[in-house]
Amino acid sequence: VHIAQYLVDFANSLNFEISIIDPRGYFASEQRFPDLKIINKWPEEAFKEIETNENSALIALTHDPKIDDPALQHALKNKFYYIGALGSKKTHENRCKRLKEAGFSEKEINLIHGPIGIKLGGKSAPEIALSIIAQLVSETHNNK
């Protein structure tokens, strides 16, 4: 949650349009994320409520495959320009195996930034959020 809170602050300051998807209302709450679009539904249902396209980005931060994997699958199928997922190299290896089993090609899976963020060396929530937003901004400019 802390990484997401810092990330939202950075993204807001850069004028990104933000939607938070998390079925767990105790994580994705108005108290934690005031003035943001919060969808407390599973990704399969949540993506029906927002318009996404090749100009969309996805940052998966839950560490829960039941939440992150469907979101990543949606992003891959809809050709989001940026897709990133939090987790260690081992977590990402396991994620890639699951996506391959779900029918995604190696080329598609390689579009996911995992572990997410540029290597700054930091371990704190604000440092991780900064590394993620830096990678997102870089991809945003490369996408134009």
Task: Report each predicted region and the residues it spans.
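Glycine-rich adenosine-cofactor-binding loop
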Residues: 1-15, 20-22
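Residues in the short beta-alpha loop(s) of Rossmann-like NAD(P)-binding domains
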Residues: 22-25, 89
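Conserved SAM-binding strand-loop segment of SAM-dependent methyltransferases
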Residues: 36-42
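Short amphipathic alpha-helix with an adjacent loop that forms part of the alpha/beta core around
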Residues: 43-54
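Structural motif
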Residues: 56-57, 82
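Rossmann-fold NAD(P) dinucleotide-binding segment
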Residues: 67-80
